[in-house]
């Protein structure tokens, strides 16, 4: 009896771990930081804790839903990649229908929380990001186009905008800058992953830039996107949304990141190692900027580009 109980307990723990795995906790955590950064930037010190918690929890559930359904969609290509071949949607440890229903359920819950506690604009951005990621990127672009990364970068840039618009209820220049910043950041971040995971992507025939058009072009794009990201990031302090601390942090991190990227042109460069360094510092950069914008906010009055009434 005790042995059977222990076995059942072990099975339940494994099943729970599998459900957590399909939500991609690392992605959720990264998005939590950016949502909080956008929210606190807009709040300017006047923080509604209930609204902030609802924004964080609601969007986390929406992101988790998108990741779970992405696992269902990608199960065939995941089986061909060393990094993903042991996912529960590939091994069958959890039935595909269960993962799909789980993804739908937490998505409905997440959107429900956003609808109840935030506003129409924040909800709209969350919905657009979800549709782009699940419907456009996962179902078609990832498998069929070298521009899949570009399309996916939009959905990756939505979380801080949702956090920002949860507070303001309007689309102003601050929201536009955040959308551009985080979209641009996604590109070198994703291309770096594609380089050090080159064999996986090639095996699954996913047309990411390094596989479809070569390493040299991918390196050019990484350097270009980092340079443009650096310029766009300075727009937050230049437009008066953040102060000198944010300007100092964005200049320092962007310059270091760009210098690191330029090392990829060395003849003796170890490409996978270099790409991992670029990837690792991309996370440091965006985390530092998210934290700094949350703390170094400035009072600025902006005319909304548009507003949605609840």
From Swiss-Prot:
Pathway: Porphyrin-containing compound metabolism; heme O biosynthesis; heme O from protoheme: step 1/1. Its EC number is 2.5.1.141. One of its GO terms (biological process) is heme O biosynthetic process. Keywords: Cell inner membrane, Cell membrane, Heme biosynthesis, Membrane, Transferase, Transmembrane, Transmembrane helix. It catalyses: heme b + (2E,6E)-farnesyl diphosphate + H2O = Fe(II)-heme o + diphosphate. The chain crosses the membrane at residues 25-45, 49-69, 98-118, 121-141, 145-165, 176-196, 222-242, 245-265, 277-297. The keyword Transferase applies. It is found in: Cell inner membrane. InterPro entries: Protohaem_IX_farnesylTrfase, UbiA_prenyltransferase, UbiA_prenylTrfase_CS, UbiA_sf. GO terms for molecular function: protoheme IX farnesyltransferase activity. It is an enzyme of class 2 (transferase). Signal peptide: none annotated. It comes from the Bacteria. Pfam families: UbiA (PF01040). The keyword Transmembrane applies. Carbon 2 of the heme B porphyrin ring is defined according to the Fischer nomenclature. This is Protoheme IX farnesyltransferase 2. It comes from Shewanella sp. (strain MR-7). The gene is cyoE2.
